[in-house]
Amino acid sequence: PTDIVADIGAGTGYFVFRISPLVPQGQVLAVDIQQEMLDIIESRAAGTADNVSTVLGTVTDINVPDASVDLILLVDAYHEFSHPREMGRSMFRALKPGGRVALVEYRAEDPSVAIKPLHKMSQEQAIREMEALGLRWAATSDRLPQQHLMFFTRPAD
């Protein structure tokens, strides 16, 4: 209930407003590179979600303070990054030691997933890229019918 959660690529806040009640003493950071999306979230949050804040990121930086976030949520966003290494480093810095990343991407391994290949990621690729940032793969859930739900952690050392 006290976690700081950053939704990277928050869009209009679909997940932001579902997470907000789960962290009543925490905070949800809605991060996006489009001010228009953040304006929508701010309008929706006014008077109803006091623990929601918006953050204007860039294509290379999520603009969140170092070691401030317990959980980063990336839903169908990572593959869109034009500068994945820089964004990855920025996310790693923002995570507290022991912090987690929940990464959701369409399954590249499954040809029945009717999404263009450029919008998919294999589990192997995701693990390789997250581990290159210093994150450790913790688990993959098969709860979603077409997407990987992968969990990574920042080492506590």
What are these regions (language model features)?
Residues 4-62:
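Class I SAM-dependent methyltransferase SAM/SAH-binding core
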Residues 23-24, 81-82, 95-97:
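Helix-to-beta-strand junctions that scaffold the AdoMet/dcAdoMet cofactor pocket
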Residues 62-71:
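A short acidic, Gly/Pro-enriched loop at the edge of an enzyme's catalytic core
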Residues 70-85:
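A short SAM/SAH-binding and catalytic strip from SAM-dependent methyltransferases
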Residues 85-100:
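A short glycine-rich, Lys/Arg-flanked "PGG" loop and its adjoining helix->strand segment in the class I
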Residues 100-127:
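Conserved class I S-adenosyl-L-methionine
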Residues 137-139, 143-157:
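Core SAM-dependent methyltransferase catalytic element
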